[in-house]
């Protein structure tokens, strides 16, 4: 019917092991049990507009075969919203907004609790098949910033409202035919 025509759903699951290379001082890299899940949907309200929403969850456990095997090294949550709009056959706009939250066990992972929000905008103009002009902009905000009282150290904040990266770029892609 109409709902299935405009919506599609997807998901995946992976259970296995992965190596933690980002260990704190005195802890060797180790293999831990990992669970990775994703779920999402695509909404196409019209032929020109497409909205994708995806949620990713990843958990890495402590070193396998040790007393810490049941511990959690980290849990990572990532939510991604992607919107594509096709103005004409040649001109399109894509935006992506990511929100990333990393909760780390400092005894097993050399990383602080991280909250990060990223936004990307990309205009694409297809001059002809094989040739495209791109104009893009991206922003990154984090909950980590330089501590004004101790400039060589990072300070943790609650929400990702400190800008840590910004880019504006233009790219021309041309296909050479021989």
Q: Which residue stretches match the model-derived regions?
A:
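Exposed, low-structure sequence patches enriched in small/polar residues
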Residues: 1-178
